[in-house]
Amino acid sequence: FYENGSLGESLRGTFLSCDMVRKELMAYRPRPKDAQIEMGTPWALVGLKATEQKQHFLPTDIVVGTDGSLYLCDFYNDTSRRNNQLSGTIYRITTKDRGNPQSPKIDYESDAGLVAALQSPARNVRTAAVNKLVARGNAVFPQLQQLFESAENPYVQVRPIWVMAQLGPKGQGYVRNLL
């Protein structure tokens, strides 16, 4: 699920799925409908040209990096020819104006660093931040409340709610009032 990052608002809220049969990275626009979510009509975000469908390309996984770029894993297992050759590639998908990714400076020690990590497009960075924020308890409540009230991206805005609900009675009361 692409929430925020370098690819811009056009992909915000897009669910991404690797389709190994079609050899494409599929994109969906989930929309709420009654008590469920409809995935919408899928479209190929990345795929082979029709004339290249027999090429060795098999998208298996997609993740969002710390810079908001997509990292697409292509794994090709040539067991059908009985030579058991394995090959694969990791593709970085980003805008043309982006250079090579820089190693992120993630501060898991300070409250401000953890709140910044909570805003990362990378799920693994956010998960580590959530665990550390919950462990700090009510001491981080003001920073989380400030992020909730100031975030412009709705996906970033809901992240502190998840943490606040785990902080005990104060956080749970705040979240309950939002319902």
Question: Locations of the language-model features?
Answer:
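Amphipathic alpha-helical scaffolding segments comprising HEAT/armadillo-like alpha-solenoid repeats
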Residues: 106-116, 137-149, 168-179
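Structural detector for internal amphipathic alpha-helices that build alpha-solenoid repeat scaffolds
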Residues: 100-105, 123-136, 155-169, 173-178
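Beta-propeller domains with acidic blade repeats across secreted/periplasmic ectodomains
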Residues: 1-113, 134
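Substrate-binding clefts and catalytic carboxylate motifs of secreted carbohydrate-active enzymes
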Residues: 112, 116-117, 121-128
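Beta-strand-rich binding/interaction modules
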Residues: 25-28, 126-144
